[in-house]
Curated annotation (Swiss-Prot):
InterPro entries from the UniProt entry: ArsR-like_HTH (IPR011991), HTH_HxlR (IPR002577), WH-like_DNA-bd_sf (IPR036388), WH_DNA-bd_sf (IPR036390)
Gene Ontology terms for molecular function: DNA binding; DNA-binding transcription factor activity
Keyword set, alphabetical order: DNA-binding, Transcription, Transcription regulation
Organism, scientific name: Mycobacterium tuberculosis (strain ATCC 25618 / H37Rv)
Protein's name according to its UniProt entry: Uncharacterized HTH-type transcriptional regulator Rv3095
Amino acid sequence: MAVSDLSHRFEGESVGRALELVGERWTLLILREAFFGVRRFGQLARNLGIPRPTLSSRLRMLVEVGLFDRVPYSSDPERHEYRLTEAGRDLFAAIVVLMQWGDEYLPRPEGPPIKLRHHTCGEHADPRLICTHCGEEITARNVTPEPGPGFKAKLASS
């Protein structure tokens, strides 16, 4: 199958499947808060200004799909905190890329609201996607999508 054949939609595409789980505004903001250390329901509700029923629903879904673990931290009264699982932590790069895009294309006059300081060197980080084989930065201009082992072309409806 030629590379140009990938320009149409296809069944089971990874971005679409991922967005079914995390593509909603509140879900992404809950993930952002979790990456910055917020674990408790009340603090999430306050920081985000999210309606409590909406927060409950999103957290329940995030636990069900395996992005968070619900862990008790108090027995009297019973209270839980929400900790990112490995799958949840692996979404960090996606959140950072969205944050960088917002800083670049929807800038605030006073500058970025959040900067990331790299623990190893102590400098503000400017994260990039890097090829693990050659070390070159990956952009939309220097990669080509190819069918992977899970590729299935979506049949056009008649």
